[in-house]
């Protein structure tokens, strides 16, 4: 058996920055309670590890305690949440991914210039909620083609932005449909470099293997999209949180296995999976499937 591990995979620069932010806060404020608004990243292993060290993840901002440390997750927050928190007696640290913050500025620029804004993405995702919450006027969330069909007639200036972790094919389809209905719309895809690189690497790898295993949590948008990309090409494709979820019958008739991981999945989970497969198949050969090198790094926020 041959095992190919996609490169790039796993943590992106925004996730690394967010996780390191929490790590530094734990060390810098040992006497303070640390809260994170939303999961810092969408991965169960990361969240469980931080919870074991006393970090409290909250969805209700009013649950934050005075004199504590509050960290915004990588997904960003609305302007209303930010203003509310700044009125409280606590230490605020913003771990919003810089590429998400860029989308926030884009939305605010469009609004200032008098555009009505379409936001393409999952209406229940923290990033989309935060992005829409950066506008003071009407913004429409479009999650599927039917949402575009149901949009009212818009005669003024119209612009769109997108969630940063969407599937490339889906994003292209949605943008093209918007342009068909509103030929004068302006905007561009905001799908980030890491999402694009991981999807393109998985697309190339899936063509070469009999089985694709994507490591990531089910609430991770980018992990689910890697799974969808894989399943359109490779007949056997599965999304797993860790190696314990692997089923023996998946390997029937399989000679070549491809592995990748979502941008919020720790590398240790991939290595655990590889070790598990090598124990199960002692003669298996493991190699990297090199698609593209990433060198992006972001500065840490002020902590």
Curated annotation (Swiss-Prot):
Q: Can the keyword 4Fe-4S be found in this entry's annotation?
A: yes
Where, by residue number, does [4Fe-4S] cluster bind? 12, 97, 192
Q: What are the binding positions for dimethylallyl diphosphate in this chain?
A: 42, 75, 125, 220-222, 264
- Needs which cofactor? [4Fe-4S] cluster
Keywords noted in UniProt: 4Fe-4S, Iron, Iron-sulfur, Isoprene biosynthesis, Metal-binding, Oxidoreductase
| EC number of this enzyme | 1.17.7.4
List the Gene3D superfamilies.
Answer: 3.40.50.11270, 4-hydroxy-3-methylbut-2-enyl diphosphate reductase, catalytic domain
Parts of the chain that traverse the membrane: none
Q: Which chemical reaction does it catalyze? A: isopentenyl diphosphate + 2 oxidized [2Fe-2S]-[ferredoxin] + H2O = (2E)-4-hydroxy-3-methylbut-2-enyl diphosphate + 2 reduced [2Fe-2S]-[ferredoxin] + 2 H(+); dimethylallyl diphosphate + 2 oxidized [2Fe-2S]-[ferredoxin] + H2O = (2E)-4-hydroxy-3-methylbut-2-enyl diphosphate + 2 reduced [2Fe-2S]-[ferredoxin] + 2 H(+)
Entry note: cofactor: Binds 1 [4Fe-4S] cluster per subunit.
Q: Which GO terms describe its molecular function?
A: 4 iron, 4 sulfur cluster binding; 4-hydroxy-3-methylbut-2-enyl diphosphate reductase activity; metal ion binding
| Pathway(s) | Isoprenoid biosynthesis; dimethylallyl diphosphate biosynthesis; dimethylallyl diphosphate from (2E)-4-hydroxy-3-methylbutenyl diphosphate: step 1/1; Isoprenoid biosynthesis; isopentenyl diphosphate biosynthesis via DXP pathway; isopentenyl diphosphate from 1-deoxy-D-xylulose 5-phosphate: step 6/6
Q: What does this protein do?
A: Catalyzes the conversion of 1-hydroxy-2-methyl-2-(E)-butenyl 4-diphosphate (HMBPP) into a mixture of isopentenyl diphosphate (IPP) and dimethylallyl diphosphate (DMAPP). Acts in the terminal step of the DOXP/MEP pathway for isoprenoid precursor biosynthesis.
What does the sequence similarity comment in the record state about its family? Answer: Belongs to the IspH family.
Q: Which NCBIfam families match?
A: ispH_lytB
Indicate what this protein is called per its UniProt record. 4-hydroxy-3-methylbut-2-enyl diphosphate reductase
Q: What gene is behind this protein?
A: ispH
């Amino acid at each position: 058996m041959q095992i190919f591990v996609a490169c790039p995979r796993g943590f992106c620069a925004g996730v690394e920055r967010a996780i390191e932010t929490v790590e530094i806060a734990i060390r810098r404020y040992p006497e303070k309670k640390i809260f994170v608004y939303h999961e810092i990243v969408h991965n169960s292993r990361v969240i469980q590890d931080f919870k074991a060290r006393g970090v409290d993840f909250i969805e209700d901002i009013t649950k934050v305690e005075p004199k504590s440390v509050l960290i915004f997750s990588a997904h960003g927050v609305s302007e209303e949440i930010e203003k509310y928190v700044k009125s409280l007696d606590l230490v605020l640290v913003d771990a919003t991914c810089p590429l998400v913050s860029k989308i926030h500025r884009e939305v605010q620029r469009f609004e200032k210039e008098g555009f009505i804004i379409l936001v393409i993405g999952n209406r229940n995702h923290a990033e989309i909620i935060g992005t829409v919450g950066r506008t003071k006027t009407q913004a429409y969330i479009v999650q599927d083609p039917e949402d575009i069909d149901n949009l009212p007639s818009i005669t003024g200036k119209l612009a769109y932005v997108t969630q940063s972790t969407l599937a490339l094919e889906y994003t292209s389809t949605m943008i093209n449909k918007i342009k068909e209905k509103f030929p004068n719309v302006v905007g561009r895809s905001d799908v980030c470099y890491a999402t694009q690189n991981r999807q393109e690497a998985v697309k190339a790898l899936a063509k070469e293997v009999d089985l694709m295993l994507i490591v990531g949590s089910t609430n991770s948008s980018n992990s689910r999209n890697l799974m969808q990309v894989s399943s359109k090409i490779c007949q056997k494709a599965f999304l797993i949180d860790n190696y314990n979820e692997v089923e023996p019958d998946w390997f029937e008739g399989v000679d070549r296995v491809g592995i990748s991981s979502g941008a919020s999945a720790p590398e240790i989970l991939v290595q655990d999976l590889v070790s598990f497969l090598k124990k199960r198949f002692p003669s298996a050969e493991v190699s990297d499937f090199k698609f593209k090198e990433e060198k992006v790094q972001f500065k840490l926020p002020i902590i």
